[in-house]
Structures are given as C-alpha cells and as structure tokens.
C-alpha cells in the first residue's frame, strides 16, 4: 500500500491550543485521544509520521515578553511547555498501541531522548512515531520554524500544519465572514501579503528547501489522513 501513497513520510505540526479542546488552558484528553486516533489512521495506511508540538496551551513566550519578562527566558519556559505536551501526547498514543519516542532539542535525559538527527530517522525507519519537543532549542524561534527544520532534516515529503481553520485565508475568517480562502498559494505570496499562517522565517526556509505545506483544520475527525490523500478541505503552500 505504501508504494501508492503520494506522501510516504510526513511531519505533523500540532499547536498547543489544539490539545486544549474547548478549554481555556491545559489538556482536554478526549480531544487528544481523537487526534491520536487520527494519527493512528495515517500510520495504518503506511505513512511514516513525525510530530512537532507547540506549547501555547500552557505558556506563550512572546506574550510573557510583552509584559516585561526577558524574551529569551520566556522562550525557554515555552520550550519546556512543549515537552509537557509531547509527553502527554506520547502517553495517549501509546494507549492506542502506537510506538512513540519523544526527542527534545533541550537535553533532559531522565525524561526523554535528546534530539539526534540520525537517531530520529532510525526511529522512523523502524515504524515509530517521533515527537519533537523543545522547539529548535533556541530562543526567538517559533515551533513553526522547528517544524520546518525537522521536516527538512527528516526528509519528509510534506509538512502538515494542523490549525483551527480549514486553510489559509486573506484575513481572519473568524473576524471577517467575507475572508477569501486560498486553495493553493505560493511561498512568495504568503510572505508578500504577510499572511498569518505561520511565521515568515519558517515560510522562507520552506521555500528555500522546496518543502510543501498543507494547512488544514484539526477539528474535523479523520482530516489528517484525508489531507494526505488529497481529500477534504486544506490549502497547499508551494512554489
């Protein structure tokens, strides 16, 4: 079945907010279990999966910096939040018998494995899901940038960005009911129009390395596998 797949290895970017469900903070385990089930559906189809998780459901470094906290310190706290999310997602996925490894860009040997590129690729070759935590390990970098970098390092065919809306719009569809949706858009237009789908540094790196990005809503159950199979609602960002 794998030979018929358009994308054989993917990286899924899951925001911290996606793990909250309808809560205002923390984790909603029913929501996380649904996400894990969607990931399992993708794995069962023969796709190798890596994941980058955000930390915004627990801590947002850029917001803390706005109220006076040192930005670098705030970003490091945010990186720790991504480790909490990665371990939470790992435990839920393992309850569904999905073999999973957490690798952190910030070494914490008692908690998870350190990020080593060759080790991560070997895990994926063995059929394990790799969850990357700790962002890039550097302050002033978003988890979107981490997702693009890890996707390139893992030789992924596509980056799947799971969001709260079903694609890229010319303005916020939650605020503007007349917002126009793009079904395909190139990297240059995302940058030129300053579309807020992900930070512009991440888009620039994706463009330089010809990494396609698919943006879709994680709220619809089964959507991850649909997007990989060219079904459902999504926007593709490519050259």
From Swiss-Prot:
It catalyses: UMP + ATP = UDP + ADP. Its EC number is 2.7.4.22. It is found in: Cytoplasm. Keywords: ATP-binding, Cytoplasm, Kinase, Nucleotide-binding, Pyrimidine biosynthesis, Transferase. UMP binds at residues 55, 75, 136-143. InterPro entries: AceGlu_kinase-like_sf, Asp/Glu/Uridylate_kinase, Uridylate_kinase, Uridylate_kinase_bac. SUPFAM superfamilies: Carbamate kinase-like (SSF53633). GO terms for biological process: 'de novo' CTP biosynthetic process; UDP biosynthetic process. It is an enzyme of class 2 (transferase). Pathway: Pyrimidine metabolism; CTP biosynthesis via de novo pathway; UDP from UMP (UMPK route): step 1/1. Inhibited by UTP. One of its GO terms (molecular function) is UMP kinase activity. GO terms for cellular component: cytosol. ATP binds at residues 13-16, 56, 60, 163-164, 169, 172. Homohexamer. Belongs to the UMP kinase family. Catalyzes the reversible phosphorylation of UMP to UDP. This is Uridylate kinase. It comes from Rickettsia bellii (strain OSU 85-389). The lineage of its organism: Bacteria, Pseudomonadati, Pseudomonadota, Alphaproteobacteria, Rickettsiales.
